[in-house]
């Protein structure tokens, strides 16, 4: 069997099993992963015969995808903000919608850096793969270096293996971010200019937990008590103690949670509370300033 024949069969199998997914892209990515060849090489030399060892590997990979396992877990990596990130089954898979949080955090950070502060500190709570912290570091480190403003970015996660994974991503992308093990603020000292988080926010009874990629993702990174609001509320209530004056907290949340999250911010005396919409025009990120 050659590349062309395997692709045709794999595309047909995937389309039959998961008609809403892009079967051609999935099949090609799996073939690239198994052979170590680029997309261009595979398509240009599609009559290349597949040896038995690679064919067995492809069969195993395709079987996992046919069962619905996300491509990111099969490959062990996912790109976010143009950064290649290692992923594991202990972390959420970084999603494009989370780039909305990064974009807004960058906008606020750049405005604050215009004031030439003596230093700039950012905290990422529940960092997972480190995606948010590393994306911010990739953009802000060159700017802070040019302006001679010391930049410190810290990412925390509850699980030690997840912290190690995030650290591996910092090393892979040669970015200076410190990753610590902590349950939210428990092991955090000092104050920050920005606090960002994509915490668990799904209700345990949500039917979407049994659909698509989330079936394979860790429930601890997805589900929160109090109909999904427990961790959001906890962070909003405590974050003010860890922010400098005029510091900002930015939180990602579910597309139907914006109104409730804004009210929790306001109940806790945050100012200039606003919600940012994602690429699908859903309320996705809510932020507030701490003026006290």
Swiss-Prot record:
List of residues binding substrate: 198-201
Domain of life: Bacteria
Stated name of the protein: Release factor glutamine methyltransferase
Gene source species: Haemophilus influenzae (strain ATCC 51907 / DSM 11121 / KW20 / Rd)
InterPro entries: DNA_methylase_N6_adenine_CS, HemK-like, Methyltranfer_dom, N5-glutamine_MTase, PrmC_N, RF_methyltr_PrmC, SAM-dependent_MTases_sf
Gene3D superfamilies (alphabetical): DNA helicase RuvA subunit, C-terminal domain, Vaccinia Virus protein VP39
Keyword S-adenosyl-L-methionine in annotation: yes
Signal peptide segment: none
GO MF annotation list: nucleic acid binding; protein-(glutamine-N5) methyltransferase activity; protein-glutamine N-methyltransferase activity
Biological process according to GO: methylation; translational termination
Statement: the UniProt record of this protein carries the keyword Coiled coil: no
Reactions mediated catalytically: L-glutaminyl-[peptide chain release factor] + S-adenosyl-L-methionine = N(5)-methyl-L-glutaminyl-[peptide chain release factor] + S-adenosyl-L-homocysteine + H(+)
Residue positions binding S-adenosyl-L-methionine: 126-130, 157, 184, 198
EC number annotated for this UniProt entry: 2.1.1.297
């Amino acid at each position: 069997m050659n590349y062309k024949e395997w692709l045709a069969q794999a595309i047909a199998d995937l389309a039959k099993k998961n008609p809403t997914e892009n079967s051609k892209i999935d099949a090609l990515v799996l073939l690239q992963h198994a052979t170590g060849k680029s997309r261009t090489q595979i398509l240009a030399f599609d009559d290349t015969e597949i040896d038995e060892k690679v064919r067995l590997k492809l069969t195993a990979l395709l079987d996992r995808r046919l069962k619905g396992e996300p491509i990111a877990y099969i490959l062990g990596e996912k790109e976010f903000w143009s950064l290649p990130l290692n992923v594991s089954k202990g972390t959420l898979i970084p999603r494009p919608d989370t780039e909305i949080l990064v974009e807004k955090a960058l906008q606020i950070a750049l405005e604050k850096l215009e004031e030439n502060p003596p230093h700039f500190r950012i905290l990422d709570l529940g960092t997972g793969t480190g995606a948010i912290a590393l994306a911010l570091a990739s953009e802000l480190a060159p700017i802070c270096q040019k302006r001679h403003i010391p930049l410190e970015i810290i990412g925390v996660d509850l699980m030690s293996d997840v912290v190690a994974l995030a650290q591996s991503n910092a090393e892979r992308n040669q970015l200076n971010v410190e990753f610590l093990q902590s349950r939210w603020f428990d092991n955090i000292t000092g104050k920050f200019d920005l606090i960002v988080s994509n915490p668990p926010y799904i209700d345990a009874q949500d039917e979407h937990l049994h659909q698509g990629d989330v079936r394979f993702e860790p429930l601890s990174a997805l589900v929160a008590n109090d109909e999904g609001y427990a961790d959001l509320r906890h962070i909003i209530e405590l974050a003010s103690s860890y922010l400098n004056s005029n510091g900002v907290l930015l939180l990602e949340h579910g597309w139907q949670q914006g109104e409730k999250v804004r009210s929790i911010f306001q109940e806790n005396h945050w100012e200039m509370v606003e919600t940012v919409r994602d690429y699908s025009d859903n309320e996705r990120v809510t932020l507030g300033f701490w003026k006290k």
